[in-house]
Amino acid sequence: MHRALIVVLGFALAGIGGLGAYFLPVFQTAAKSTTISDGLPNLNPIEPPAQPFTVLLLGSDDDSKFIPDRLNTQSMILLRVDPGTRQATMLSIPRDLWVPIPSHGMGKISWGYQFGGAEGAIRVVESTFNVHIDDYVWIGLNGLVKVIDMLGGVNVQVTNPVMDDYYPSDLNSDQSPYGYHRVAVLPGATHMDGVEALQYVRSRHGDLRGDFARSERQQQLLLAIKATASHLNLADLPTLASAFNGEIKTTIGLDRLRAIVSIAGNFDGPNIHRVVLVPPYTSEGFAAGQSVVFPDWNRIRPLVSQSFP
């Protein structure tokens, strides 16, 4: 069955959820891309969404070390948008959270995508947090780099330095996917291009807070993308869309995209709630011979029930 794939950058609602920019669509029918009409900005008005909706945002390595669509997710963010209250919440899920994986026993929550693609990731997040997910968005390494470069870069206020001697050299196909190089991001106001922004949110070595700090940086970058992309409108989408080829994937259709964009301006700073499951909600330890993050469900469940009713 032919269906449009709306491809996004980290949750783009030009304001919603603080997750970043507009949805950046790439329309594909089967494996063949189609083009967007020049008349797109003049499409008939569409009814804005009235009911709350939840989107699972996924970020993965997409290099030659892995089988396509069977990757571990490096970033998982659950986003809920309530048009009625004009409130949005984004919850960063630790990739090493030790949970039951449907049909696979206990494992890291990031394995859901590896075992079952986007549907597998949705199943494990829904069953773990007792939430309903309406749609998903997946973005690979090169997709994020392209989006940010097309926006002319982003401005980020770096509060803690990032010093990583073991950053993977796997972005380009002509590089060894198993090599490493040094990455250094110093504190202060910084303008980042796509590669620099990716390094900032992907690096996980040399930070005493580990993946928790990386989750905070990912949310920070999405807010920076939102601020940079706030000038975009539907007329810009054809140019943006032409740059992507399977590097961003989603289940959100065109009409729903337009409806979401129509309410984007209703969301801003105080109405955007950011949650990271740092201790005491979680604790680090070992299971099955590997480093994992253990959830404290007595603390997490009330938090999730309140944020994702």
Residue ranges and their predicted role:
Residues 1-309:
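Non-catalytic, solvent-exposed segments at the cell envelope interface
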